[in-house]
Every structure is written in structure tokens, then in C-alpha cells.
Amino acid sequence: MLSIADIVDAVAFPFSVWRTLGGLAPEMCDGRPVYVAGNAAVSFCVTYRGERKMLKCYTRTNENLKAIYGAAYRANELCVIDMVGRHHWVDCLLMDYVEGRTLDEAICAATTEAEFLALAAGFDSMACELLSSERAHGDLKPENIIVRDDGQMVAIDWDNAYVPSFAGRRSPEIGTAAYQHPARTADMFNKHVDDYSIAFISTLLHFMAVEESAAEHYRQLHEPKFMPSELINPNGWQPTSALAEVLETFARRGMAWEYRVAQMLSSATPYLSDLKRVMGFSQSPFDGNAEDVSLEYGPHGWWGCKSGERWVIAPLYSGGFEPSEGMALLELGAYRHFISLESGDVVASFDRATNVGPLRDGVTRMRMADGQERVITREELINSPKKSIFVR
């Protein structure tokens, strides 16, 4: 059997036999090629015909690779000689090198809410594109995602991907446990195999943006604060303590679509049928010029605000009031939030023990749990120094 060292030596040796990639030169450090060894392959950064490329040499055969990568996959490309002199032809992959750092590295480097939100936005954009395609990655995790300098994200290492021609086959791998639904099996192999991973990573990034302890946990251990198995209650529909913490955090801040995606993590199945629709709201630009906005209900009995046939505020809330004076008052997880119809931002939030109504004549009245009342003007809502000023 070939060793990693055998392949590294062959790539480094200038007179190795290549079927089509003659002239390829690996990047070197202290006289040895720079490489990363994985479960079934060794990857190198190389120069080929004047361009920087990624070369991947496989230690074992994977019959799916040609369908996944097309012309970039080169079967029996490199001749490798093992320590006893036997010759082996190794399958290779040559692709454009993606500049940037892994999402794992980016998470550990992020220190502010803005940096985490930028990572979350980049991931959500990539995820929505993937959900709209007919393929799936199969092993999404921070180490398999590159963050470019412009914030865009690119998934790498598609060796366990699903493409339509694989319909009816079993998956060669079932992904990394920390980012997969515990019920995923090799028989679950279609375009939905990334559903749970996408929901999990998106939730993790948004949660770390507003919960420092989750970010610090990842920096220290390079793993999520909670595992998928901690989010699924096998005995009922009530959220586990870990999931309840996430939902409470999102509900307090009026993070509606993030809240609904997080709810899906309690699913008994890896397939999340509503994920594409709900995450799609994260990519919809807000229209601050909408007219005749009214409260309407949508799928699942969730509420939002419409202008004609178009959703101005996505139907993701558990209740609400008719918009008035440029504000919509909507409820999420028993918290009420005033949302600006000009910007779409949550301008003020009220905790579950407080009863507050919509704006009338420029004011809203808040009744607290102890029976005390307070009148709050529209200007106070808009000019609050922080969105959660009324949440204890």
C-alpha cells in the first residue's frame, strides 16, 4: 500500500512520470513540498503552466470522482514508486487554487460582532446558492470552506459530493459527526444531504456573533459549543436545553429567520424541507419604499407584513399587529419587537413579561409585570441607544 511519504517524494522528484501534467512544480519549504494529508489523499499547492493550482493525489480509488470533477480529474496520472520498488499509478485532481483562509481559521480570528456577522452573511449566501442547485457537498464543515479576502465563501473538497447521476447510490461517506444529523446514513444520498449541516453552521455563526461564550469555546477547542445530538429531543417536541438557549438568544433580539432555522435543528430527520425557503429571506433586499403595508399570515401560520403580493417583512413571526406610523410590532418567541418599515431593522424589543401595543398618535404604552405603565414615544423607540433597551 502506498504511503503519504511515497506520494510526497514522487511529487517532489523532478523526473517522476506524469501522463499529462509534466512540468508541474510544487511549492517547497526546507527542500520538501508543502502538503496537507487527508483521509484518502494528499494535497499540494503547485505551479502549472504559470498558474497557481491545487494538486490532489489520491491514496485509494474513488469511482465517483470523475462525475464530480469532470476534466479536472486525471485517472492514473502519476507514477509512484513505493519503498520496495513497485510502481503504482495514482489518480490526481488539478484545480484552481482558492486564495483565502478556512472558515475555521476565520472564526478563530474574529473578535467582534461585525466580523462574525460578516462570516455568517458570506456563509448564508454560499449556502443559498448550494440549496438552489441539484448537487450537494456531503461534508460541509468550517475546514472545508475557504473565506476569500472579499468575504465570499467557497466550499472545497467535494470528494463525497452528490450529483444527479448518483441517484440511487449509497454515499461513500457520511460526513463529519460534529456537523451532521446523527441519523444520517449512507442510504441518505441526494441533493438534501447538506440541509442539516447548512442549518447548523449558519446557526452557529449567528449565535457566536451575539454570544461571546460560544465564540470563545470554538477558539479554544475548534469545535461548536453544542453538538447536533444535543439539539434533538428524542422524547418529544420540546427543545433541549442547548437549543432553548439558542432560541432564547435569537428571540430576544428579533432575529426571526435565524430563529426559524435554529428550530429546524430539532428535526428527527436530516432533511429540512423548509430550509431553502426560510434561508432565502436572508438574501432578499429590504424595500423601504413599500406602500399600503399590512399584517398577513403565511406558511405554518407565521405572520409577516405584505405590500400587495410582496412580502416586506418575511412571514416568520408568531403574531403581530397592523403596522402603524412606519412601524410593525411583531412577536417572536414571546418577545415583541418594533421593526422599522423604512430600514427593516429591529429598533426596540420588549421582554415576555411586558405587554406593549402598536404606535398610536406617536406613542406606545408598555405595561410591565408589576402593573406599572410607561408611555414611550416613537422618537424614543427610534433613538434608543441599543435595540434591546426595553428587554431586561
Map each language-model feature to its residues.
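Residue-level detector of conserved, function-critical positions
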Residues: 283-392
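ATP-binding glycine-rich loop module of kinase domains
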Residues: 31-33, 39-72
